[in-house]
């Protein structure tokens, strides 16, 4: 296969489809999403069978446990994909919305209209759910998309893409509005990220190695996050039960996600009370605790205890490992977070309103939480219907990227024959 020519043809079809999608009406887009959701439920057995082929190959190839977890398409995951599409249907269509209208002294009226970005290239690894989430959001926001999933999920991605294409066609929309890259050749990624004439933005969802490569090589703008180094700070005004529940969930709910807590900060005055209780919970999951000197002194006897190094504070483990640091004040906690955080998601546990609001204002992250698990940093949980990714950049989109993040604004001007003096 001539990869360059193949990707050029994919890009040309996507660009053509994007023009049709930009003017598609809300009813047709919603109808397509409902067709796809129904097909996912109807074809659940076929999807599980395709996923099983991927899982068998992945296990034989020694795929890491965290990636196997992401690759697995459970009954719950299938149901969640369909529900996510139905949530997107229920959301208002942002396309064509005009806002910020104002009259100018010259007599013209100026406002902004929300429009699609155009063609969105999405690169992801062993996450078949992204195929549906991304397709749904792109359809509703009037964009075309080119999906390049990881080779580990090729069978499942192809099965899902077929259902998406059929749903689009049934609703009278171009099937090429959602295309999956059929080859697992990595050269296809290199072509996709260097086709600005066909692709308007790239959304990568993958490991650090993938993101770093794209940052070096891409000539198409990106919406991305590099790491998910998330913190929870237990303040000395925290409710103990809330702290235990939140910190156990934030670490142990799922290890392989970017919104999992990787560093726990504890106020010195409550550390001797809260850490032993947390250790009992973490021991049930055999979580390795990498503590500073003070934390290790409190945690003596914990069966999975190690010393934290400077590198640990800036490491995304994606595993049953947690770094633990004792801090003397809220100022020290905020300073540590702003120094080592990846600006993804950080949380405080406290009953002190003033401290909580300071934390919200001063922590420079895409999501900042009070008395809630970092695991809530997710488009589905935020009511976005689904998310196409999470951005910890500051330009265009920040945090979970839903419908609005896949649109742009253009200025619109209404006049009555005015000319500029």
Curated annotation (Swiss-Prot):
Pathway: Amino-acid biosynthesis; L-proline biosynthesis; L-glutamate 5-semialdehyde from L-glutamate: step 2/2. GO terms for cellular component: cytoplasm. GO terms for biological process: L-proline biosynthetic process. Keywords: Amino-acid biosynthesis, Cytoplasm, NADP, Oxidoreductase, Proline biosynthesis. It holds the Pfam family Aldedh. Catalyzes the NADPH-dependent reduction of L-glutamate 5-phosphate into L-glutamate 5-semialdehyde and phosphate. The product spontaneously undergoes cyclization to form 1-pyrroline-5-carboxylate. This is Gamma-glutamyl phosphate reductase. It comes from Janthinobacterium sp. (strain Marseille) (Minibacterium massiliensis). The lineage of its organism: Bacteria, Pseudomonadati, Pseudomonadota, Betaproteobacteria, Burkholderiales. The gene is proA.
